């Protein structure tokens, strides 16, 4: 007899994940557990994505981790979660599935109005230093007057991302996500903001986060017309060589599996692939495809 319960204890979740040889590398807000005779058989960790909800004017949920001892149990757990999301009028659910978890991917693909919206490759490396010639542009922290130019550069710079692949999100909505994401980072979310300027013009930017012993490349963009001029290399090298970054154990970056240019840059700079994921958006209120 299966039962689904909310608010599973942190200790029970950690014990279950250890039994599955899984690690939790992201924070979460809520938990849902599938139990059989009082034994935990599966967990679903999720959060209200308040920031996305505000920008898109939609109710958005992010599933941070989904795991069970069998595909059947995982399906039972996710369908219980999905039913509640239908009742509380959630607009869309974002689910990240490890690429090797074929069972989980199959369960998500079977849901009504489920859309594959991309894939992510996570790469990592220890902090290091680089031999490099001085760039033809200036690098440094942004000035207050740079904000709008940086946010405008975010427009159409991330078209390979999941938001642009969702048929229920307009191009303008996807662009607004990244412009407000960039602005939020400039307003204090990011631990590091770096801007590249040429003759006073913003031609690139990078934003990095700090989480425990990990420095995370969050956003990076180069102005059209300046690609192939090593701007991204110098931005990333500048981040990695920051004194605060050097205190971290690893530097991580993520990009879409089909973003070959970005992957080649990261590999040339010493990053190695660590994990890959499939991304899905599910719209509980939409009609089935």
From Swiss-Prot:
Q: What residue intervals traverse the membrane?
A: none
For this UniProt entry, the molecular function terms from Gene Ontology, in alphabetical order, are: acyltransferase activity, transferring groups other than amino-acyl groups
**Protein's pathway:** Spore coat biogenesis; spore coat polysaccharide biosynthesis
Give the enzyme's EC designation.
Answer: 2.3.1.-
* Gene3D superfamilies from the UniProt entry: 3.40.630.30
Q: Does the keyword Acyltransferase apply?
A: yes
Q: Which UniProt keywords apply?
A: Acyltransferase, Transferase
Q: Which Pfam families match?
A: Acetyltransf_1 (PF00583)
Q: What class of enzyme is it?
A: transferase
Whether Acyltransferase counts among this entry's keywords is yes
Residue ranges of domain N-acetyltransferase in the record: 137-289
Q: Report the protein name in the record.
A: Spore coat polysaccharide biosynthesis protein SpsD
- State the encoding gene: spsD
């Amino acid at each position: 007899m299966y039962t689904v319960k909310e608010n599973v204890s942190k200790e029970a979740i950690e014990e279950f994940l250890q039994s599955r040889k899984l690690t939790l590398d992201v924070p979460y807000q809520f938990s849902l557990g599938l139990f059989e005779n009082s034994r935990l058989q599966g967990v679903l960790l999720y959060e209200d994505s308040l920031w996305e909800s505000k920008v898109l004017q939609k109710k958005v949920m992010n599933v941070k981790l989904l795991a069970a001892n069998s595909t059947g149990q995982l399906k039972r757990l996710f369908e219980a979660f999905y039913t509640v999301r239908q009742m509380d009028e959630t607009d869309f659910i974002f689910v990240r599935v490890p690429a090797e978890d074929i069972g989980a991917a199959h369960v998500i693909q079977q849901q009504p109005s489920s859309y594959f919206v991309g894939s992510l490759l996570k790469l990592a490396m220890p902090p290091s230093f680089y031999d490099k010639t001085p760039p033809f542009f200036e690098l440094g922290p942004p000035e207050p007057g740079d904000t709008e130019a940086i946010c405008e550069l975010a427009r159409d710079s991330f078209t390979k991302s999941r938001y642009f692949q969702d048929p229920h999100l307009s191009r303008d909505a996807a662009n607004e996500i990244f412009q407000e994401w960039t602005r939020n980072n400039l307003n204090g979310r990011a631990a590091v903001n770096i801007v590249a300027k040429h003759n006073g013009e913003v031609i690139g930017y990078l934003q990095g986060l700090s989480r425990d012993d990990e420095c995370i490349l969050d956003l990076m963009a180069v102005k059209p017309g300046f690609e192939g001029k090593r701007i991204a290399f110098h931005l990333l090298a500048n981040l990695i060589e920051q004194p605060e970054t050097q205190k971290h154990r690893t530097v991580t970056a993520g990009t879409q599996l089909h973003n070959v240019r970005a992957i080649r840059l990261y590999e040339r700079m010493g990053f190695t692939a660590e994990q890959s994921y499939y991304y899905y958006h599910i719209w509980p209120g939409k009609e089935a495809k």
